[in-house]
Design a protein with these regions (language model features):
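Juxtamembrane intracellular "pre-TM" segments in multi-pass secondary transporters
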Residues: 1-18
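Extracytoplasmic gate region of multi-pass secondary transporters
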Residues: 13-70, 154
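Structural signature of the two symmetry-related core transmembrane helices
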Residues: 81-96
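Multi-pass alpha-helical transporter architecture, strongest
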Residues: 173-199
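Loop-to-transmembrane helix entry/capping segments in MFS-fold secondary transporters
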Residues: 49-50, 133-143
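Interfacial helix-cap and linker-helix signal at transmembrane-aqueous boundaries
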Residues: 42-43, 73-74, 158-166
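Paired small-residue
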Residues: 103-111
């Protein structure tokens, strides 16, 4: 809990869970940047322009449908477990995108659609496990501010990867790797909570 005057950045900086939450948010946010390259990934896989453009729609469908159940799933399974499972679904989407087949990239885009809600839905629920009330508002504002600054270069880098390699495989791979790191951070956060309860 923060001091009476409220939670300060200095006190947050002394909490290891702050860095877990910040980096988990950052990794989830960076993974969502792949969304803007989905049409190009479809063209790379040999889809005609009309079908490739549909990949963004498929991702949006995955995005909207996942938002409907993530909150409920968190109530049933807990925020940590739901966060972990959601990342795994996104990773399956990444693998399907990497396969580069017309059918696989369409299915991959649908499953990838769960990625944006990782930062917009699951990260706030994750933070609420560590901070309550006004402390949560303060902590989450710092998490989002620093997390966004940390990964903002990936907006440019994801495009540069294609310029360097002539393929979106590296972009998809780096996005997937960032989510693997996010999964490890979420797991570590869950472990920290369990240890705290036992203490």
């Amino acid at each position: 809990a923060g001091p009476e005057k409220g939670l300060s950045l200095a006190s947050l900086a002394k909490q290891p869970v702050f860095y877990l939450a910040l980096l988990a948010y950052a990794g989830a946010l960076a993974g969502s940047y792949l969304n803007m390259f989905l049409t190009s990934c479809g063209l790379d896989a040999g889809l005609p322009m009309t079908a490739a453009a549909m990949m963004t729609t498929m991702a949006l469908l995955g995005n909207m449908s996942s938002k409907l159940f993530l909150g409920k799933a968190s109530d049933v399974f807990g925020a940590v477990r739901t966060f972990e499972l959601s990342i795994l679904v996104s990773e399956i989407g990444h693998v399907l995108l990497l396969l580069g087949l017309p059918a696989s990239v369409m299915a991959g885009a649908l499953l990838y659609g769960i990625t944006p809600p990782l930062s917009s839905v699951m990260a706030p629920l994750f933070c609420k496990l560590f901070w309550k009330g006004e402390d949560y508002g303060t902590a989450y504002s710092y998490v989002t501010m620093f997390g966004t600054l940390l990964v903002s270069p990936f907006n440019t880098w994801f495009g540069k990867f294609y310029d360097l390699t002539g393929s979106y495989d590296l972009t998809i791979g780096v996005s997937g790797l960032l989510l693997v790191i996010t999964l490890a951070l979420v797991w570590a956060g869950g472990r920290s909570l369990r240890a705290e309860k036992k203490a």
